[in-house]
Every structure is written in C-alpha cells, then in structure tokens.
C-alpha cells in the first residue's frame, strides 16, 4: 500500500523541487476512486485490500479460486484476468512463483494493461519479465513501476535501474522493526510448540500444509 500512496501523491518529486528551492504546488491524481487490481488474493492480497478500501479505492482481484465470502468481507470484486489488466490503475502482484507464474507479466500482458498504469511487484522477481517492463516504462505504456523483488538477489544490475519511473527496493516490503520482532516471536513459538507436541496451523502460510 505504501507504493500506491507514493505514486498517488508524488511526494518524492515535490520533495526534490523543494530541495532545489523551487515552490511549485501540483495537483496529483490521488488514490480515491482509482482502481487497485490485485493479482492473487491470498494473505498479502487481503491485507492490501483492507488498507486500500478505506482510501475509497475500487479494489478488484483475480485468483484461481475466488471466494464470494471474501468479496463481502473485504469489499472487493472478483474479475477475470483480462478485465483485471484492462481496468487497473495500479496492478499489484501477490502470487507465489510457480511454473505458471514465471514471467506472468510479459509483453503480451503489459500490452493489455491500461496506458499509464502502475505495476507493483512484491511477489517474486521472475514473476515479471524485467526487460519487457523496462521497455514498457521507457515507451510510456507503464506510468511507473515499484519492484521489491528480483530474479536473483542481491541484485545490482537490474535493467530497471536505468528507468527514472521505476522505484526499486531491496526486498524490504515487509521489513519493519515490528514485523521483524513478530517473526522472531513466531519462530520461537513454533519451536516451543513443536517440542511440546502442540504445533498448529497458526503460522502456516498454506493452511493445512505440513
């Protein structure tokens, strides 16, 4: 959600002008009324939806196993893949890396997206074709992109680094002091529960898996 708000308000661009002693107020598009398209609606997708709806965004999603109850719970709407790509002002990728999601976002999918839309990849690096995304940014097909994950990490040679409209972060989308503490506690809890023979599904990413 931080990436959505970053692009919606263009704070960085305004900050740079102020540091150059340039006073130039601008009207930015904002988030209200914009369509946030979630590709994948697991735990991360749901958490994003919970934060986007209060900003009065129109949240749509696509996944392999839609659940009508989720639509009521999170205030979102299921659409097919084609509609998701066509209507999203922001497209957030929240899927695991599998054979079917490798280069999920390639030139063909990018061509289907709304011109000027914004791509956000917080899934896994190979889910996007970096070179196709780079071309889409340079041509203006994509308005911007936020990428937190890369095909190989550490990554210091991404072609996206040459695109001023790409915001790149070193796989830190979930890296906060609070999250780190919670993950450490969860790890300790799992070890203690396992030793006591009481390990449950509380911290499982895929419920029911062992």
Q: For the regions a protein language model found, what residue spans apply to each?
A:
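Short, flexible hinge/linker loops that cap or flank conserved catalytic cores
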Residues: 28-32, 53, 111-112, 160
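Short, structured coil segments at secondary-structure junctions
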Residues: 55, 74, 162-164
């Amino acid at each position: 959600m931080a990436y959505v708000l970053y692009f919606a308000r263009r704070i960085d661009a305004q900050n740079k002008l102020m540091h150059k002693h340039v006073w130039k107020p601008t009207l930015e598009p904002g988030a209200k009324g914009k369509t946030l398209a979630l590709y994948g609606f697991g735990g991360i997708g749901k958490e994003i939806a919970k934060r986007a709806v209060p900003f009065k965004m129109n949240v749509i999603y696509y996944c392999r196993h839609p659940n009508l109850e989720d639509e009521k719970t999170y205030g979102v709407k299921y659409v097919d893949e084609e509609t998701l790509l066509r209507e999203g002002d922001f497209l957030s990728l929240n899927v695991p890396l599998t054979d079917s999601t490798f280069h999920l976002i390639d030139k063909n999918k990018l061509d289907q997206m709304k011109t000027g839309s914004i791509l956000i990849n917080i899934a896994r690096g190979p889910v996007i074709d970096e070179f196709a995304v780079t071309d889409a940014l340079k041509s203006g097909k994509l308005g911007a992109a936020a990428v937190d994950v890369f095909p190989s990490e550490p990554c210091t040679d991404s072609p996206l680094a040459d695109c001023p409209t790409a915001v790149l972060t070193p796989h830190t989308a979930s890296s906060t002091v609070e999250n780190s503490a919670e993950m450490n506690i969860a790890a300790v809890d799992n070890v203690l529960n396992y030793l006591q023979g009481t390990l449950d599904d509380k911290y499982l990413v895929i419920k029911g898996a062992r």
